[in-house]
Amino acid sequence: PQWFAAIDRPVGDDQDKFGKTIRERAMNSIDKMVEWTPKTGRNRLYSMIEARPDWVLSRQRAWGVPMTCFTKTGAKPTDQDFLLRNGEVNARIAAAFESEGADAWYAEGAKNRFLDGIVDPEAYDQVFDIFDVWFDSGSTHAFVLRDRDDGSEDGMADLYLEGTDQHRGWFHSSLLQSCGTRGHAPYRGVLTH
């Protein structure tokens, strides 16, 4: 299956100052939080967010950032137990990535390594899809500005600066991801050249 971020479904995380859905949060952030230089940048990104469909997060390629999840064998995506949600499994994956990098996901025996002793590895399929590169790029705000001694206190960038092509790319993906995880834009200003 493909993996989507539903941008019109309520996020349900109590970060509703700018709206309940990713789309509402993004459009309100564009209007109420961000200074646009030039001003036409606001209209460009706003119209893209206003008209966009749900975000397809997955890609079927041999390289990229793996999605690192397991699905129940034979289950449908609509089944409650389709996706394995287990903190101990997630901790094993995170530890492997910290010590070995993303290639740990593709190593021989990875499924057993991550699942054995917690759940029956035979009951789950390892997902080999990767994230859309714009999802990967859009996550930079979380690692550059948050959870670091030299990051900003509120985790927001003062300015994103790129060419106008990034309205469809980095500005767009950063906005959607931050609105989904933090409730608002990751930047105070956007300047395009």
Predicted feature residues:
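Structured secondary-structure scaffolds
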Residues: 1-193
